[in-house]
């Protein structure tokens, strides 16, 4: 099959056919069955042989191995030095490093662990600076401000992407052209291609942790978000990608797109969970699974919409009571919004080292982004109550509605204007993840003419044919 035919065979983002879903599930089953308990890195073989290649294999194996939970500060410093040495050798050797690798897993493990150690070190450093309780560690951190620095980590990821020319290769695949024509001397090697590819997913994660959600989505411009993508072949990478894309959409108030992303991966996980058990990443995936259901509950409360039956049932089972409270709105829902957000959001980090001399000036990045999100929630607190009244009328006097709500008419007018503005969302149709068209996100619309509210409502009928087909498949 030519590259053009393969490109045309790729489904678009909205393609959710059962045949392709089943194919991906079967592919994942094969991956699990193939794993005989040995690490993928243990099966790595060398093209060149010799001690130098064996040393590189050992370094890659160490880079993919999680650091101990209670690792000392000196161990974290040493781990950073080891990563620097490894990536310097890969990126700056005279010519590409000759190493053949058998699978995608090892490259994801290396990038994933690299970013996890960066994230955990930043949180630890911020915690030491804010507490001021351990002067010895604070002094060590003060003397080494560039260790696990944001610039260093981003430089590694961007360098791996540039060296492998992976973006050019992905763009060529989109155009139906041969990616090897754009790969260059380095990008044609699996070592560089895989590290470069998963560095793109790593950039998505890092930019999201830093709070730059637009740039996070921008990094995936050349990656097709479908079941044929390379990241979809590694369960942890598949899950991570959709989690951070969905969360970025949520923070940009694109709730419909966030729900679509979360729903896609949660449906997939529900179909593969029986043979995930026992895998190394099962516990982490199960935790992220619960977090995404919490985020869907938040999104549905802020943007009422119909969910897939599988997602809706699981959501009711996990967060039924909380979802009802969120959907009713009002001041009493604020603590619950904050609780769910804190439990499900990424562990944000600061791009700069903390101020060790003035601990009180250091702000927890999670607190900072939670406050930003809660400001948005406060703007929409009374939307459910207002909607419940407006649904009863086609026209209504502003002062009459203000009397029902026991608020000043001008305050109600500002609420209505905010709600009207929030109901217009950008929704993805095609192209890059940042692209989209503004649409009215609610089934209830209204217009203000002086003090008269004109209300219109559109109701989408339930697609009974799809419902019957899904349930017949379960029975038979």
Swiss-Prot record:
GO biological process: formation of cytoplasmic translation initiation complex
PROSITE patterns: PCI
Domain PCI: 257-452
Principal place of residence: cytoplasm
An annotated Gene Ontology molecular function: translation initiation factor activity
Keywords for this protein: Cytoplasm, Initiation factor, Protein biosynthesis
Keyword Oxidoreductase included in the entry's annotation: no
GO terms for cellular component: eukaryotic 43S preinitiation complex; eukaryotic 48S preinitiation complex; eukaryotic translation initiation factor 3 complex
Subcellular location: Cytoplasm
Cytoplasm keyword on record: yes
Subunit structure: Component of the eukaryotic translation initiation factor 3 (eIF-3) complex.
Stated family: Belongs to the eIF-3 subunit L family.
Function: Component of the eukaryotic translation initiation factor 3 (eIF-3) complex, which is involved in protein synthesis of a specialized repertoire of mRNAs and, together with other initiation factors, stimulates binding of mRNA and methionyl-tRNAi to the 40S ribosome. The eIF-3 complex specifically targets and initiates translation of a subset of mRNAs involved in cell proliferation.
Annotated protein name in UniProt: Eukaryotic translation initiation factor 3 subunit L
